[in-house]
Every structure is written in structure tokens, then in C-alpha cells.
């Protein structure tokens, strides 16, 4: 909270300095809350996605969820003149994610590493469609703001949509047992008396709403929903109910750490946080792919 271009010290806050207090409550606190909510929400979205798709390489950034949210945003801008129609963003995000989940469930890949590769191709197709529509209807400037995540412009009144991650995380925790059963397999879930398709749909709704809300406010945070759940599972096991709060905590810590790096690495200028996360996430993702290939 005390790292930034504008100087602010704890002494100024405690002494009641008007400018320091305004900066603290208008910019620094909202930015901190946005970082924590985005990190926790997107990490939980990745954890739930990996369960319902039965693949540890699945995540909002490798299944087309984020690209579908971007398509919904551009369509909202084109048809309604602004991107405030959240129902369209969430709806297209849910539809695209459900399509991908059904696709990978119907086709049994010989290796788990094919799922994220197919997901990235699917996401690229959606992104190409989105870019074409944005070019055609002069909405490219609105779209480009989403391509690079940055917390620098987060102010009070700009980030409150991220609070939707809180009830979504709670619902994920409440449905953890059912989602875990679905993650084992359809036959197992049905034998337990669960409505398999209903649980999958609920999981996709949770993933899409959390992912879309983060992307709309912050932008794309690549690989976050992939690496955090996998690292938590590696060190703490596969108990979904136990891993949900751990994943939320470590996701928030990771984004906070990357944000500090992005602020300090070229200080007093600021690097977009998506660049830092992309470098870190890309290295971890490649390591996971190589490890998965060795154990395939």
C-alpha cells in the first residue's frame, strides 16, 4: 500500500494528512482489494474447472472461458453501445465453456497434455472472431484495454464488481463434495445419486462468472487459474474442500507479489502485471507439460 509513484508514509496516515488519506482510500485500498479478489477468484475458477473437466491442465485461460467473455463484451459494445450488459458477457462465457467441456468429455484424448492445447486453439478461434467483430464495428479500442491486465487505474467505484467472487467462492466450497464426485467420473457421480449434468452446469457457471468478472475489471491474468491449483494440489493433496481456501489465499498472494514486481521493476514507471504473470506462468506451465508427458 505504500509502494507507488505518489509518496505516502505510515506517519502521514497516522497524522491525518488529508492528501495521504485521500490517496489511501481512493487508490491504494481499492487496488489492494482488487488484487486479492482477482487472485482468489481466478484461482478458484481454475480449481473448479480442473475438477469438472477431469484434467489438471484445464483453466479459464486454456479452455476459452476468458476469450468467450471478451466476445460477450464486444457484442455488448456493438449491439448496445457499451459493455455494461453483464448478462451477455456471462451468458456467452458460460455457453463457450460448456461447449468446450462437453467436447473434451466426448473425445477421450490419449494424453492429458492435449486438452490445454486444444483449449488454446479453441480460445484463439474465439479471439479471432472477437477481433474481427471489433475491427468491423470500430470497437477495437475497447477490446485492447482487456488484453493487458493492469491494476494502476483501479480506483474506488471501479472494482466493486469483483465482490461477486466472494459468494462464488462460498458456493464452490458448499458444492465441493459434488464437484469432487463429478471429477472422479460420470458413472461414479450417477451411482451416488447426483445429477451429473446439473453439477457440471453449476461448476461452469461458477467458473464463468468468476473469470468474466475479473477480466471485465482487470483484464487477462494468464495461467493464474492453471498454476495455483496445481501447486496447491501438489503440496497439499487433492481434497477439494480443503484446497479451496488454500487456493484462494495463494492465488491472492501470487497476484500481490507479481503486482509489487510490476511496480518496482522499472520504477517510477509501471509494467502491466499480465507480463509478469505470463513469464512466471509460462515457465511453470511448460514444466507441468514436460512433467505430464514423462508420466503419460
Q: For the regions a protein language model found, what residue spans apply to each?
A:
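Alpha-helical transmembrane segments in inner-membrane proteins
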Residues: 1-296
